[in-house]
Every structure is written in structure tokens, then in C-alpha cells.
Amino acid sequence: MATTRLLFLLVVAVMITMVRSATLHYNPTVINLDRGRPKLHIGMLTSWTNADNSQGTGFPSAGAFPLAIQYANNDMDILHGYDINFEWVDTHCDINLGMAAISDWWKRGFLGVIGPGCGCTYEGRLASALNFPMIDYACDENPVSNKEFYPTFLRTIPPSIQVVDSILLTLDMYDWNQVTVVVENITKYRNVFNTMKEQFDMREEWEILHEEYYAGFDPWDPDAAEPFTDIIQRTKKTTRIYVFFGDSGDLRQFAISALDVGILNSGDYAIVGAVIDLEIRDSQDYHSLEYTLEASDYLEQINQAYEQMFKLREYTRTDDERALEAMKSVLIVTGEPVLRSQAWHIYSAIVIDNALDEPFNGTLELKTDIDMASVYIFDATTELLKALDATLQAGGDMYDGSQVVSNLFNTSYRSKAKADYQFDENGDGVKSYVLLHRIPIPVGDGGMPPGSPGMYPIGTFVRAESGHWSFNKDPDLNPVWHNRDDPPLDMPVCGFHGELCTNWGLYLGTLIPAFIIIFGGGLGYYIYRKRAYEAALDSLVWKVDWKEVQTRESETNSQGFSMKSMVLSAISVISNAEKQQIFATIGTYRGTICAIHAVHKNHIDLTRAVRTELKLMRDMRHDNICPFIGACIDRPHICILMHYCAKGSLQDIMENDDIKLDSMFLASLIADLVKGLVYLHSSEIKSHGHLKSSNCVVDNRWVLQITDYGLHEFRKGQKEDVDLGEHAKLARKLWTAPEHLREGKSMHPGGTPKGDIYSFSIILTEMYSRQEPFHENDLELADIIARVSKGEVPPYRPVLNAVNEAAPDCVLTAIRACWVEDPMERPNIIEVRTMLAPLQKGLKPNILDNMIAIMERYTNNLEELVDERTQELQKEKAKTEQLLHRMLPPSIASQLIKGISVLPETFDMVSIFFSDIVGFLIHFSLSSCRLFCSSQVLPLLVPWLHSLLTLPLHLPLIWMNPLISSFAQPSWSALHSHSCSALHSS
């Protein structure tokens, strides 16, 4: 971006230098209107004369500029209250003069410029740098479409490359995918070809070849080398459709050359030409030069000049006849022609008069008719003034170029040509194109009577505001193809070299038997599958004989079902050793415990729709879909048997306070529910229709399964359950989507997937609040249902106070997305699964796997804990052994450590030292606290107090008489102070 800006500044600097060098030669012509009102000024650049003072391209079309100014000054709706004055400059197609005029007009406060009419990149870049509006009428350069560098530049003339869209539509219309493009080697037509080639390259099946002829070829010059014969000879064997990009006269000569080569006689070739110049032509102008001479009613010298020019080419009537014959195979795409009405002739005359009058003062030479440039000049002037008026009316700044031109982008206007033109998003002009074909003209044209052959429009190419082009064919006009009834093919049926038909005869004997075998096999397989399907429909594998269903014999309700086996009955399931609570009517069918769902009908008609439903139910197989066991149609036991899930429904679990639900538990149940809905919505059943927490059951493995799905035709027409109260009927609707509530009884029993998504959001609120839906809403059930179905803004939904505290953000986001009022704005179940993906982060697919993973982690931690506790136990054991050895004799301690019982012993003789505690303390308070250290005392003694009180406990062996002396000695020593512990008086 910085480099781009630097280049932009450099270009502007160069422009300023060029402007300064040209300022001395700048000579504008000023036209002022003074009616006593404020004056506004605009300028026009045109090439009135060439550098050699010969007549330029601006004559006589520039005469439309003062005419447009005059119309605006007289129009009460354009800049009312102002006089619009103008200046014009003859640039001679000199860039310096044009930029000098732009710079001067900008400094003098002009409001915009029309032109320059020649090259426009430098002038447009300068005007954009000055924020100065510029609308051109003849510029055909591609860079000016880039609004990053040319933000204030627009043009009423369509760029040449715009014709490519119409060319491609023509090729599409006739299925022409392979073409050879013949291009004049000049920038204008090379740009058109390159744009077309880019479109071809984007389509794999399209193929484009390319031929060029030299620039400046003059078909009227007898000395000019005719390039087309060689091109046609080189390409005719690999081409059927030619696309020609060159001048109109060159196209005429190319068609004549193709006729001379002989490729047009068979009708197998066609030419599509693009005529994108400024000339205004009649139906005869594309092929007949004689018509041009005879129809011209201008001055005599003009006819003489034309005749003199054509004599150089040795013109003969035969040329026109050959061109007319060649045009049978030519289609021409060109701009929508001007309606040659009386108003147009008046306009043309005024433009020419203006060109001959002040301020132009032109002279009448060879060219006496106006072209489309006059229309583009008139339109550019008018649209600029309208944009200024719109800016003024909006309170804007008319001197802000960007603000002024912003009123023109992507707008349509009525052109002076009496057709609807446009400015696109790049400020380029847009007009309609027509497809010309040689047919008998339906109306007189340019003096030729109806029925004369001519190139006449058979349809119009129109651009919509979206930028899309379409072809509007005239229903009354059809192309007349040369020597055939339909358009030619873009290649022969067998290819240009017969490659598409090679060896068909050789392989015919193999292909036909192979086809018969494949077709016969496919047909047989189809018949087999069809019969198998019909047999599956006719089979009664789903049918359950009520006699095979074992239920508890007790009183029954009106449908013949056991009343004691209804909801919340507490019986034991024989196949399960544990006591379990039963949450539905259950029975045993062929050894399988099943939930029995009564159908309140008197009989079942086994129509094809019912049998198809039963087959679909049998085919439903998924871990999170409750299996269908069968159906009983025996009166009065009409019912549906589903697999029984012992843990009950999700609603039962939510209401059971003994079951603690942590985040892992809830995440697992939600994941199961989502997986079940994904399978259900992708199956042929499509949707549940009555999804609620009571229809979500949990089996012994804590896997959630969806039940009560499908069989809508089977249940159709059943009576209401007489045992169901009014409150329960209303409570069932709390999960129903508002659009289904509004449908009432007309609701399809199967509902819709988006209705299931709404029900899913209500179930989520139950799971995280552990309460019934809408429990925090202070309204009766009937009022709640009425407000939900009403579709209020914002919609009435459950209060989420409890859910906000417990649920993670992803769940809250999913809830709010799933219960929006408009079903089309609700996510599908796949998108819901993505929303809730954070819940499953780090978790296994189901809750049992998660519990096993937790137990594995616990086991690993437990092993480490056991090792640690074992080491601590060993240390404590050692401490205990030491304590035992200190408290007990070694022999006794050893026996206890080994676990051997210590038996009591009997002694024949014992010596006991007696002393009361008081006397003992008084006596020994007079002694120092020392151990007995006499050699006569056994070293088994401990400190005095402990030793004297526990001496009998330390007898390791049975001693005889020495024992007496051993125990007597310390006693004697204590009494008589004969120990080495000196007694001292207090």
C-alpha cells in the first residue's frame, strides 16, 4: 500500500510538471449566461481539431454539450436559481492541454469537467487527485475503472470489454463451447479478447483458439493485403464457430472472405462479430455500401466524396451481394440502436447547428451525421448537473468531488437515446446490447421496405442492477440459419478428426452384450430389491401375539393392561437380582423385558403407510435410540413394545434427589441425547415430534436412549387417554415448539427437526435446574402455553436463574440459540453438537467409560498409597517391638512378637520387697538420685522408683537361693545406707 501511494504521488508530481509546461498554450473558450442569478461553471474537453488542424473526433458531437447546458438552465428541477455557464477547450488530443485546463478550472472554482474525449488516464488521475468530478464520453481505457486511483472519474460510454458478457451469453445460448477468435492487433480489441479468454479459462469444457490480423487494415484500400483468407484456410479444419473482434468494415470483409473460401455454403459454420464503435447504423449498413450512397440525402458534395472514395476500391454491386449472402451466417453483437424518431432527427439537427455556430464555429466537411458520442456527451453533462443538484439538495458541498459523484454510482438514468443506461459500481457506463441476424426486417428501416433482408435485432442483452446479464429474445423473431433449421454445431458430431466416432463398429459386438448384461443385471438387482422390500413390508416379523406377552395378573384398565404395572409401581424384575423401580407398563416378551405403550384404538388397518412405518421402526438401530421390539394389534391389547430401560426416564432421574448428577454425568447424558437426535434426524423418520424428558430413557449402563418416536400412522386416530388429567395434558405441551402450538390439532404428528431442537433446549433447562420446565415462571400452565404460542417479542421462555448458576457458557448459548422464535434461525442438530463440543472435552463416549477411566486413575494412585502406607507400617512395627522389649522381659516380648501365647508360671519360692509409698518417698528423699552401682547388685536394676516397684517383672529365670540374696541385698542396702549412694542429712 505504501508503494502504491508513493507511485501515486510520483504520477501526480509528473502531471503537475506537465501542466505547468502546457499552461502557456491553454486557451479556453468562455460562454457566460447572465440572468442575475448565482453562477455555476463547468468545463468540457474535446478534440475539436487534430494537431494538424484537420477535423477532430469532437465534430460535430461536441454540439450536444451547450444543448445539455441549455436544457439544464431551462429545467426547473436542476439547480433551480442558478445560471450554469461553461468553458470548453480544444485539446487536439494533447494530454498537457487537457491537464492544464483541469488544473485551471479547479483553481477557479469550477464544479466539474466533461471529457477529455481522447485518452483519459492522466487527466482522470489528476482530477481524482484534486477531488474534481470528471465524466468522460469516449474513453475506452481499462485502468480508470479502478476507483482506488480514479475515485472521481466516471464515463457514460461503456468500456469495450463490456461486450464480452453478451458474446458469452450468445455462445451459451447456442451451446458453442469451442471457438476461434480473430482479433485486430490493437489495444482495444486485444483487451476484449483477453477478458473473454479469462472467462473461457474458468470453464473446463470451453476451448478457445486465437488468430490476429495486422492493425490498420483498410478494407476499402485496393492495395491493402487482405489477411483473412489465410486465417480461414489455416483454421477451417479445427473450427466451426468464429468470433471476430475488429471494425465493422473488417467484419464485412471477413464474412466475404469466408464465403469465397467456401466454408459458409454448407451452413456448418457461423461467425459472431462484435461492433463496438460509436457509429449509428441502419439494418443495411453492415453489408451494403450501395445503400449508404443511395440513402444519403445530404449535400451533393458528400455523395461525390463517397463515390470518389469507393472508386479507389473499384466498388461493384457484386460486393454488396456477396456481403449480403455471407451475412446469413453472421451474428452481430452491438450497442442498442438509437430509435430514429422525429425527435431524434430534430436533436441531431440541433447538435450539428451548435457545432457550426458559436462557440465552436465548425465548418461542414465530409462528416455530416452525429454519432453516439453526442449522446454520451449530453448524458454526461446532464448527469453531472443532476449529481450537483442532489448534493445541493442534501445540504452537501458541491465542491467536494467525491460527494458529488457518489450520487451516480450504481444508478440508472434515461439517456438521450431514449433508452435506460446505467453507471455501475466502478462508474463505467452500461447500456443494453442487441443480437443482430440477417432476417427479413419486420418494419421499414432507413428507407427500405418491410421484408427486405437486413441485420435486425432478434433480442436484447440487459444488465440487471445486480450486475447479471440476461438475454431477452423477441418472441416474434427467429434467426434464419443458412441451409439448416437449427444452429450449427461448434464441432462435428465425430470430432474434427473423427476421434469421437473411432472404432464404434469394432467395439459394437462387445458393447452391446456388455450393455445387455449390465442392464439386465441392474434390472434384476432392482427387481430383487423391490421384491425384497415388498416382502419386508408384507412380512409380520414386527407382529406380537399378546398371548406371548407375560404381565402380572391383576385388575386391568379399559385397554386390558395391568393397573399395578403402571407408572411408579414397585415390583421386582425377575431377570435382575437387584430391587429396581418400574417406570412404565412392562411385560416380558420371549424373555425380553419390554415397555408396553398402549394405543387407544379399536383396530389397526394395515395400510401400506402403516407397514412402511413398522419396517422403518425395525430398521432403526443406534445405541441412543430405544429399540423397537414389535407391535400388537390384537383387540383390546393394541400396543407398541419398546425395549425397557430400568433406570427410567430422564425426567424420573431429574426428580430423584438420591441420584447426584455431576458435570460429567450431565455431559454424558447430553451427548447421548444429541447423538440420538443426529441419527433420528438423518433417518427416514426425520423427526420425533413430541420430544420431552419423559421420552428420554436410561438403561442399566446409564446410556440415554430416545423412545416414543415414529409410528404416527399407526397411532393416527387414537382416542385420548381417559386416565390422563387436564393438568397432565397441559404439562405435555411445555416442550412443544411455538409454531407447533399455533398449529394445534393440524400439527403433523411427526413434527419437524427444528421443533425437536426447541424441545431439546427445554430439556437442557430441566437437566441443569433439576426442576420441571418453567418452574420459575409465576404463571399457570395454560397461561404459559398461551404466551409461548403467541410469539411475543421478546419470546416468552423459561426463567434461567437456576440454570445460569449451574450450566457452562456453551450450554447457555445452545439453549438460547435453540429456542429462538423463528424456526429457520434455529441451528440444526449438527450445529448444536458443535456448540456443545466443549462439554465432551477430555471425556469418553459414555458414562461407564468415564467411570472406568476414573477407576483406573484411582487404582494407579491407590498402588502408590499402599506402598507408602506399607513403609509407614514397617516403621511403626519396629517401634512397637522396641517398646515391647522395654516393657516386658525379652523372652515374653519375643513370644508376643511371634504371636505365641504366653502361659502363666508357678514359682516355688519368691522374695518380695514391701514398702509403702509414703515411707519409701520419705526415706529416699534423703538420698541422692543415683543408681545402685554395687557389684553385688544385679545390673538389671533400673532407676530406683521404677526398679523397686517392678523388680518381680524382670525375673528372666527361676533362681534358687541366690535369688533371695539378690533381692534382699538392695533392700538391706537401702535401709542401712550401705550402698555407694551416700545418705546425707537434710
Swiss-Prot record:
Main subcellular location of this protein, as a coarse class = membrane
Q: List the signal peptide residues.
A: 1-21
Q: What keywords does the record list, in alphabetical order?
A: cGMP biosynthesis, Glycoprotein, GTP-binding, Lyase, Membrane, Nucleotide-binding, Phosphoprotein, Receptor, Signal, Transmembrane, Transmembrane helix
Please state where this protein is localized.
Membrane
Read off the lineage from the record: Eukaryota, Metazoa, Echinodermata, Eleutherozoa, Echinozoa
PROSITE patterns assigned to the protein according to its UniProt record, in alphabetical order: PROTEIN_KINASE_DOM
GO terms of biological process kind: receptor guanylyl cyclase signaling pathway
Molecular function in Gene Ontology: adenylate cyclase activity; ATP binding; GTP binding; guanylate cyclase activity; peptide receptor activity; protein kinase activity
Identification of the protein by name: Resact receptor
Q: Which parts of the sequence belong to the Protein kinase domain?
A: 568-836
Give the stretches traversing the membrane.
508-528
Q: What does this protein do?
A: Implicated as a cell-surface receptor on spermatozoa for 'resact' a chemotactic peptide, and on various other cells as a receptor for atrial natriuretic peptide.
Does the keyword Protein transport feature in the UniProt annotation? Answer: no
